[in-house]
């Protein structure tokens, strides 16, 4: 599992060593739990971090707003160390389960190569390893999905799975 910082420097997050000496002080690393926690980051300057989860591994990250993200194997996750502005935007290639902290004034947006998912506070799973196999499954709350080509947003309700089709439309199933 690697963490790449703004400057391109990569840090290997190793369960056998303490990562607290190699990561910025505000980020609490818990190697034995395979977790990074950004809730203590207080800054008006943000950095972009990239977590790469290899095959056979998984990892949890708690973003600065309290949103919890469980990353599955073969996943890249791009996120800011602090959310600044009117939106909370992250990018995903792979699969992750999100438990989004509620913030009615700042929607949380997950971008993949083919889908954009917009939420205000909810739990959902996104699988987007390839453009041909992109799914968004809603657990709780409400989300809206659209293709990245500017299509209209489609609202999901708990238990629904939105599967992106090659024509840019979604098939909804329960």
Roles of regions detected by a PLM:
Residues 173-174:
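N-terminal periplasmic "start-of-domain" segments of outer-membrane beta-barrel proteins
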Residues 1-133, 144-169:
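Short acidic/polar, Gly/Pro-enriched loop/turn segments located at secondary-structure boundaries
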């Amino acid at each position: 599992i690697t963490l790449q910082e703004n400057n391109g420097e990569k840090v290997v997050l190793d369960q056998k060593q303490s990562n607290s000496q190699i990561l910025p002080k505000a980020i609490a690393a818990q190697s034995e739990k395979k977790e990074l926690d950004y809730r203590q980051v207080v800054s008006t300057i943000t950095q972009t971090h990239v977590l790469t989860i290899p095959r056979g591994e998984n990892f949890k990250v708690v973003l600065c707003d309290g949103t919890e993200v469980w990353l599955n194997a073969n996943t890249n996750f791009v996120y800011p160390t602090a959310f600044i502005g009117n939106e909370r935007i992250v990018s995903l290639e792979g699969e992750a389960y999100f438990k989004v902290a509620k913030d009615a004034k700042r929607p949380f947006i997950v971008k993949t190569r083919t889908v954009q998912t917009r939420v205000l506070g909810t739990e959902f799973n996104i699988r987007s390893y390839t453009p041909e196999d992109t799914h968004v499954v809603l657990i709780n709350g409400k989300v809206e999905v659209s293709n990245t080509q500017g299509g209209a947003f489609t609202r999901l309700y708990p238990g629904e799975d939105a599967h992106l089709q090659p024509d840019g439309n979604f098939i909804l199933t329960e």
